Amino acid sequence: TPPNLPRKIPDGVDVPDVHTPESGLGGVVAKSAGAERSPVMALVGNWRNLTWLKTIGPVLSAGRSVLVVAASAAEVSQIADRAAATWGELVVRIAGEDDKTDTRAWQSAQSPPRLVIGTPKTASWLIGGLGLAIVLEEGRRAMKDRQTPTLHVRDLMRTRSRLEGFNLVFFGPTPSVELLAAGAETVREGNRAWPLVEVVDRTEDQPGSGFLSERSLAAISATAKGGERVFVFTHRRIGFASMRCTRCRTLRSCSRCGTRVGRVDSCPRCGTAIGACRNCGHTEFEEMGTIPDRLVSEIDRRMGPGAAVVHPADGLVIVGTERDLAGLPMVALAVAADVDGMLLGTGYRTTEEALRQLARLALAVKEGRGTRLILQTSRPDSLLVTTMRRGDPIPYLERVLVERAREAAPPASEMIAVEIRGAVPEAVATDLASLEGAVAMGPIDVLDGKRWLLTGSLGKARIGLRPLVGRWRDWGATVRVDADPIDV
């Protein structure tokens, strides 16, 4: 946080007279304007239409400030540009351009009323006269600090709200299961949390038909010929593409535990060798998803050379991955090339992450006639696809909560990952096993080091871990401690 510079804090700005539309935010906005407390809210809906920016007027008119936390600088800029058209000089933008700009923004944020829009680092900023904070898509990876002590914006803002007295709303299509488990009040914004979805059943396609179905290619071609943008979503790595039998079209899976697998020799969950198709015994499989460059080639064969490009190149048909969604302009058509591949893996967050990514992809689709998200899948009746079709994430996430409790995974229990890079002190395993109330698992190999997991009720273990980490660092080891890690 920049230093306190009281003599440089500017005077307040007059609030424009703006009509307040109806919104799920209405109740908490009214209470925030009257300095009344409201329960923490999980507002389930489409924040990217930005119509909700006009609903915060009563808070600003009451002389109080509003903080909006977005996951990326690109999204901060998009929101701030739209907000400035309504609220003018009240808008304070913190996109992390440079220290001088951030300090100037911090000075402005001290003179309410202000609409402060910033990246996750602003969650720790003192905001003058803060009455309402809105956090967008708190489940995103960017909302958690990768460096020790790995603070999460969700936990930081909940603590600040309780201590400082401002009201707090988490707004997005898929609230995290941690937020639901914490008892946040769930409110739906509109009938659907994301735009319309079309499902393409890939079991109808003949083997060797390619990574994109004929229906998807036709939709991509028609949309682009109409001058509208298309985004084709795929995986970062080829090993995460699903595979199906070329004879019976059944998805490839482990014969022992049933885990769906891609191009691997053994099951990542139980270690069993992956052999022939479980359904028919056939030994030939084909990939249903691939890396961006190969999708571009397939689209170009249909539409002509140069028709598709890999993000961040500009064109009517853009192919990219999750990391490209933040700066993506709104599109008329989005295509998820391999929905089934999104469920590959053994991490306890896999199912929640799949829904979150697809919902986020859906929010990139603009409102309008014929605009939609296409999901390609060989399991059209799966719970994930059914949830996307219905536009309501809550039943799916409640089921994830039950599964987490059954597996004793967060938020049903606590989990800490301890990573040591470089030379590992000999007594690490013994030290971790001695922590009271903790079950120590590991180590497993990670890049340049080892990782251990601690699970259980970790209140006393956290206290005991601190001197151990200090001792290991004094010994010369590089130690990273991650509470409730994402990639496990």
Model-based region annotation:
Residues 150-154, 292, 296, 351-355:
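Amphipathic alpha-helical segments in well-structured domains
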Residues 1-198, 202-205, 214, 221-236, ...:
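Accessory, non-ATPase domains that flank or precede helicase/AAA+ motor cores in DNA-metabolism machines
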Residues 138-139, 143, 278-285, 338-346, ...:
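Short hinge/gating elements
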Residues 216, 222-302:
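Cys/His-rich short segments
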Residues 196-201, 268, 278, 335-336, ...:
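Active-site-flanking beta-strand signature of metal-NTP-handling nucleotidyl enzymes
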Residues 175, 211-228, 298, 302-488:
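C-terminal helicase module of SF1/SF2 nucleic-acid helicases/translocases
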Residues 170, 206-210, 285-289, 348-351, ...:
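Hydrophobic alpha-helical scaffolding
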Residues 134, 169-170, 231-233, 244, ...:
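Structured core elements
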